[in-house]
Amino acid sequence: MPHEPLNSYRSGPDERGHFGIFGGRFVAETLMPLILDLEKHYALARVDPAFKAELDGLLTHYVGRPSPLYYAERLTEHVRAIAAHAGGRGGAKVYFKREELNHTGAHKINNVLGQILLARRMGKTRIIAETGAGQHGVATATACARFGLECVIYMGAVDVERQKPNVFRMNLLGAKVVPVQSGARTLKDAMNEALRDWVTNVTDTFYCIGTAAGPHPYPAMVRDFQCVIGEETRTQMLEREGRLPDSLFACIGGGSNAIGLFHPFLDEPNVEIYGVEAAGFGLDKQHAASLAGGRPGVLHGNRTYLLMDADGQIEEGHSISAGLDYPGIGPEHAWLKETGRVTYLSARDDEALDAFQLCAKLEGIIPALEPAHALAKVVEVAPSKPRDHLLVVNISGRGDKDIFTVADYLAPVG
């Protein structure tokens, strides 16, 4: 990575893993040697041309990168019709960054391949991971199958039930899926179990975290592996339009797809950046919008915004999307909110469902429920932008995994 200026938004974290007051590494004493060893190996790998060449080769020939930057013509017509109905003449030109076309159907594989190559360098033979929607679990199981590594996936029992297609895929790929019965039996609880496993099996096990959270160096490492999204978008938009986009949109659970798109543009002051959290039933009801409805605290090894009750106990997040119900957020997003560089919005379940159907009917693309949250805000914001405004939304995953969930929600009651 080129040297960043001191006033850069891209220079974090510091040597202790902090983005301002966020981040860090709050871990058990038994884990600290593993964390420091991981940090050392990652620092060496990221400047090793052989590591980059191997990862780039896999991204090209195994994942199918670069993913297309697609002009969503009919969605653009739709937002311009909304603008015209309101008496305006605007409506942004909407592009999709099509991460759903990657092998395994989401952005998760970008990060997993980087971490698995690192695990092999470290001599680890057993890989563990947590998963919510199942996309990170599938990506991890896929990479482990590719390299002949033992794979154990921790998944909340509720998510096992609502993401059956992905559970079958993981089993088919040779992974052992462990349903987690503690707590709310969702992603937070799966992450707790994975951390317990890691402490118990320190010698042969590598923990492949799926989002830009956790103890340092994970937030920075996951971000770096996902930055291929934003770097490609930058190149592709310059080729298509001769200039950078005017705005970026991405959904946020832990926030890896978003930071991967955003990071290469953070020092471009004319590029507006929007992250979209899950507002669930509404911000005054059950939701998973940590930035909108949470406050700073420590969870899973880092300080960030968390959903907490008055006593500081972690509350359970709710979203129709299994990939967005984490009750925290990556620490770099917490810092970007504090600095004001990124604007964080939220979309309710019903808004995401509407956008899910709209995208399918207008573009012939069935998005995952996660990026449907971002699409909901695109439909809201884009009509107010001028016609020459170039907007990119990250379609971070495909919707195959969600069709049964959506069918249940849309089924007439009684």
Swiss-Prot record:
Top EC class, one word: lyase
Cofactor(s) required, per the database record: pyridoxal 5'-phosphate
SUPFAM superfamilies named in the record: Tryptophan synthase beta subunit-like PLP-dependent enzymes
An annotated GO cellular component: cytoplasm
GO molecular function terms noted in the UniProt entry: tryptophan synthase activity
Pathway the protein contributes to: Amino-acid biosynthesis; L-tryptophan biosynthesis; L-tryptophan from chorismate: step 5/5
Positions carrying N6-(pyridoxal phosphate)lysine: K108
Gene3D superfamilies: 3.40.50.1100
Keywords attached to this entry: Amino-acid biosynthesis, Aromatic amino acid biosynthesis, Lyase, Pyridoxal phosphate, Tryptophan biosynthesis
Catalyzed reaction equations: (1S,2R)-1-C-(indol-3-yl)glycerol 3-phosphate + L-serine = D-glyceraldehyde 3-phosphate + L-tryptophan + H2O
EC number: 4.2.1.20
Subunit structure: Tetramer of two alpha and two beta chains.
Function: The beta subunit is responsible for the synthesis of L-tryptophan from indole and L-serine.
Family, similarity comment: Belongs to the TrpB family.
Protein name (database record): Tryptophan synthase beta chain
Native species: Beijerinckia indica subsp. indica (strain ATCC 9039 / DSM 1715 / NCIMB 8712)
Name of encoding gene: trpB
